Amino acid sequence: MDSIDLIGIVYFCSMRYRHYPLVILMAIAFQSNAQDKWDLRRCVDYALVNNISIKQTDIQARLAKIQLYQSQLSQYPGASFSTGTSYNSGRNQDPTSFSLITESYLSANMQLQTSAQIFNWYSKRNTIAANQWEFQAAMAASEKVRNDIALNIANVYLLVLLSKEQEKIAGIQLQQSQSQLGNTRKLVNAGSLPELNAAELEAQVARDSATFIMSKGTTAQNVLSLKAFMALDAATPFELDIPPVDKIPVEDIADLQPDAVYASAIANLPQQRVNDYKIKAAERNLAATKANMYPTLSAFGSLGTGYNSRANEILSATPLNAPLGKVTVGGTLYDVYPLRPFTDYTYGKQHLFSQLNQNFRQSIGLSLSVPIFNSGSLRTAYERSKLNIQNLQYQQQADNQKTKQDIYQAYNSAMVALEKFNAGKKSLETADRSYGFAQKRYNVGMLTTLELVTNQNNLFSAKLENALNQYDYVFKMKVLEFYKGKGIKL
């Protein structure tokens, strides 16, 4: 019922009878009860959110997406920073002056490195394309699992509806037997019928009670199976919205010819896309493994600097031009000076940033990597990639054959189910008429109790068989509609 209609009814009742609070509570209770029922759409939607298998396939799709993202990032240059510090004593090489010393000192080094592949025969590009197809395959696989879960839920849902219908038929049968036993017991007590008639009906009531209890157990078991597919807690209250089976829309079987359904399935079913995407991914992986067998050209560069605790720097310099001595020439005394003046230096500890600036170094270059011999690992990877493509192609053929076989089997099963359903309806009509005649004859004493029970059992069996045939036909048709790409609708 629409919310607008419900509000209108509430308003009308409140104005007509002036019991506004009571009407509101009744309306809320009615709406809540309607919402608590589970139809097929609600069951499927709940399963798509909570089913463990679906969650696992979603994780696989997310892992494939992460792998794709990582391969895309591999196109860009890599960079790393490293640093270290050490305390040295004894005879060591000064890392800044590269001279041998015997003093103890503290040193530190820092380096930034980067590298990038310039050309690798499109190995990375093919790897990215392969991961892209793998991601698409994972998404299609997730969709396939969702479709399989929906189909399984529809199957179990129909089984629950069938078991409930059989339970209803068994309950009616039990009520009829109990009513007949009550009437017969009155006639026996009045002396109109022998005790044997009542005993036979008591046995029939016992059999009908057992059948009714078994049908209730079957319904409960099917409900538990449905909850399991939905990942719904077994203790959760659960009431199905039961549509009349004759109101379930079913496409005309003439529009579900197996050849046309198979062509539609190949074009639309996610399993076919999974196979297509995996083959394309394998072809790209083959190209990537082949590229790894050729030389790779790369560029690299680095920046670095260092620090040494014993490094000194000149704080000041004083030129010295003092005479070295005296000399007498021709009786004259002269001062002797050096050809070059001396300089007196004052040293002190070199500061950190001064050292980092002074020791700053750079490098850049190219490298060529040529695979010559690697124990056949690259060739093995290449051959395995080729065989993997063939294996996936065979898997695709096998899946296509199985899909075609399943469709033809479903079509033949639907045809048989339709014929059984039509024949069952005639059998039910005949059994119903026979039971009606038997009741009339029994009421006037022209039929024994055993004969009446036999006719009643025949009618009961015909009802059960008709319900089974009807639900079986509906499910077979829903399978064909599923393969055609119509989804599951009840």
Give the label of every model feature segment.
Residues 1-40, 48-51, 488-490:
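Bacterial Sec-dependent N-terminal signal peptides
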Residues 69, 113, 285-288, 367:
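Outer-membrane beta-barrel architecture
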Residues 82-116, 244-253, 300-370:
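Small/polar, glycine/serine/threonine/aspartate-rich low-complexity segments that form flexible
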Residues 148-264, 413, 417, 458-459, ...:
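Periplasmic alpha-helical coiled-coil/stalk elements that build and connect Gram-negative outer-membrane
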